[in-house]
Amino acid sequence: MAIFAAATRLATKREQTLCTVFEWYDFYLYGSLSAIIAAQFFSGVNPTAAFIFALMAFAAGFAVRPFGAIVFGRLGDLVGRKYTFLITIMIMGLSTFIVGILPSYATWGIAAPIILILLRLFQGLALGGEYGGAATYVAEHAPHGRRGFYTSWIQTTATLGLFLSLLVILGTRTWMGEEAFAEWGWRIPFLLSILLLAISVWIRLTLSESPVFKRMKEEGKTSKAPLTEAFGRWENAKVALIALFGGTAGQAVVWYTGQFYALFFLTQTLKVDGATANILIALSLLIGTPFFVVFGWLSDKIGRKPIILGGCLVAALTYFPLFSLITHYANPALEQAQASAPVTVVADPSECSFQFNPVGTSKFVTSCDIAKSFLARNSVNYSNEAAAAGTVASIKVGDQVITSFAGAGLPANELKARSDAFNASMTEVIREAGYPAKADPTQINKTMVVVLLTVLVLFVTMVYGPIAALLVELFPTRIRYTAMSLPYHIGNGWFGGFLPTTAFAMVAATGNIYYGLWYPIIVAVMTFVIGLFLMPETKDRDLRDWH
């Protein structure tokens, strides 16, 4: 009997992990093919409608996920884990498949982007319900003392889903050629999701309900109002707040910094070509991914709290030197130019905006904003010098001074012409000063860059490997799905999701390419302090505690 139970647990872990990989595959396709999708569905939309669609696409990726956590978390605590995440994967899979057959703007007009955004919103809602269900289900099947190890496999699924989506896209692109892929071949990865959906539904139909939930339901102890019980009672709401600020907020920024901001830093700041950057990131993920399981297993031995909080602290203490070293090994010419050719922006401080632009639709057209935006895009460190009110901003590069221009009120065509001229003159000046247009491939120390990126990924595995077990153990069975899902998706959807745009705005405002790292550092330190004093250790808790 014990052997059969162990085999069932292992099969549950394996099958649930596979299904969650498929769901992440569906979610990542949109991001991986966003440029082609934009050309197919938004090319004929007027600016006002495009702004609305951009906001909604952004909401689907980040802001909508907590609402999915509420909807499906409640359902999971009312009717069961198995059937709830069966619903989430059907919504995700069907939404992805429909994108593959959806006519473009040229065929259906305005209806095409509207339907696309609705499908994307459904994807965000489904993803908001998937994680809590998968983590709860696996944890409630896991043997006591091994929940960290079992749930850590769920933590590998986002990385594996990204790998799978990139592999399918690369294979299709190579087979068809770039022109055919951009015209219609991009639909194939979306259409293939119907096969993955069929496999996932079959797997989940064969799974049994969580034994802990099943027993609780048989004894009539399920919650009649999970949302009210989870967040309307202070004793439970307090735990959810501690889980957010003392757990998932720090976990999210460390996760995004190690996997997404590192890629952004390589391609946008250090100007490493996209293919090389993707290979470097992929190698670091390949090396680091097994450590999700290692740290999950270790958390069963020494506790969830020391590993997660330790990951937040060591990340906060080492981000600046690590990213400085990445610059040194990935683009030494840029590092040298920053040291030898200092740049100063002279501007009226009242004209300098904090360029926070999460959906990419805001326009920054003061002379200061135009100057700083150019320098930030070109990875040029600069200092700030205050000028008299109303002064048009200028940029000093050594002995040269280039005057910016005020773009407010200019017609679109004139604004573009002035911007192009300013950018051209500034580009010539910074190239003469030694700032490279891109990283020289022959000067990139790929081995050292992969080592440094792997260190960042190891921080990710420290905070992310044990987090599912921690969240599951914080809440009683009757409200577990609901209560753990919301802090997880607020942390990852909002604290983590805003990281790239917040970091870029901080860089543009201060003139330091590393200044954006203060955002994840501050959040990680906040989580360390709150978690240290308020977060309980949970590894020895019994999940059969329903009260």
Predicted regions and their residues:
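Glycine-rich segments within core transmembrane alpha-helices of 12-TM secondary carriers
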Residues: 126, 148-173, 196, 322, ...
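Central cavity-lining transmembrane alpha-helices of secondary-active solute carriers
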Residues: 55-74, 93-95, 160, 282-295
